[in-house]
């Protein structure tokens, strides 16, 4: 069964469409929310298509696009993110709502937590930075994120929003996750290594455990 989902979420602050395939492969949306908007070259920086993955992230915030591109690439996903947000106010609503909606898409695409490992962990270095992530597909939304970022912003994304995006994803996905940057002095590297570590952990957690069982002593995870 294909583990895919397409979610549309409209509020007074953001209009979002996300399509996700947890196992990669071809992915498309029926109709883009950008149909009346001219696409320029700046929108192509987080776009990649191969025989195994389709990734196109257009949140309106360049560094957020970069992080979600890295997450999708190393998790093995195909991912399309479209967002029109109230960036004339600030980046908060856009970043938060994209995280929430991606989490909802993840939960829907995964379906019943059955026949998968449930737990996953990963480390990812980026030059001097090293991050660790541990994930539990628990249906218990909780996130501990410690990245130690010191800059006010990276590109147009506030550094305070970077852990909040991850927390919002965990809430929407109903998963427990711990993400820590263990060392590093470049905030770009610290953040990117964290998203890559999370990708490695998620990829393990959603992989087959060789059974058709629910991986819980409760017998259910919903």
Swiss-Prot record:
Pathway the protein acts in: Amino-acid biosynthesis; L-histidine biosynthesis; L-histidine from 5-phospho-alpha-D-ribose 1-diphosphate: step 6/9
EC number: 4.2.1.19
CDD domains: IGPD
Matching SUPFAM superfamilies: Ribosomal protein S5 domain 2-like
Catalysed reactions, semicolon-separated: D-erythro-1-(imidazol-4-yl)glycerol 3-phosphate = 3-(imidazol-4-yl)-2-oxopropyl phosphate + H2O
Keyword Amino-acid biosynthesis assigned: yes
Keywords, comma-separated and alphabetical: Amino-acid biosynthesis, Histidine biosynthesis, Lyase
Stored NCBIfam families: PRK00951.2-4
Protein name: Imidazoleglycerol-phosphate dehydratase
Organism: Scheffersomyces stipitis (strain ATCC 58785 / CBS 6054 / NBRC 10063 / NRRL Y-11545) (Yeast)
Lineage: Eukaryota, Fungi, Dikarya, Ascomycota, Saccharomycotina
């Amino acid at each position: 069964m294909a583990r895919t989902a397409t979610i549309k979420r409209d509020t007074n602050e953001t209009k979002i469409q996300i399509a996700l395939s947890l196992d990669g492969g071809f992915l498309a949306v029926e109709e883009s929310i950008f149909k009346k908007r001219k696409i320029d070259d700046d929108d192509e920086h987080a776009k990649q298509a191969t025989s195994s993955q389709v990734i196109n992230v257009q949140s309106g915030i360049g560094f957020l696009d970069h992080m979600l591109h890295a997450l999708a690439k190393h998790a093995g996903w195909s991912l399309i993110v479209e967002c029109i947000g109230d960036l004339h106010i600030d980046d908060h609503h856009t970043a938060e709502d994209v995280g929430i909606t991606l989490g909802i898409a993840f939960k829907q695409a995964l379906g019943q937590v059955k026949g998968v490992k449930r737990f996953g962990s990963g480390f990812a270095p980026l030059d001097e930075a090293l991050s660790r992530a541990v994930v539990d597909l628990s249906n218990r939304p909780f996130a501990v994120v410690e990245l130690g970022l010191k800059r006010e912003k990276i590109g147009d994304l506030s550094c305070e929003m970077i852990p909040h995006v991850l927390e919002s994803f965990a809430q929407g996905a109903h998963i427990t996750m711990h993400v820590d940057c263990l060392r590093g002095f470049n905030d770009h590297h610290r953040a990117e290594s964290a998203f890559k570590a999370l990708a490695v952990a998620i990829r393990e957690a959603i992989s087959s455990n060789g059974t058709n069982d629910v991986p819980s002593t409760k017998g259910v995870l919903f």
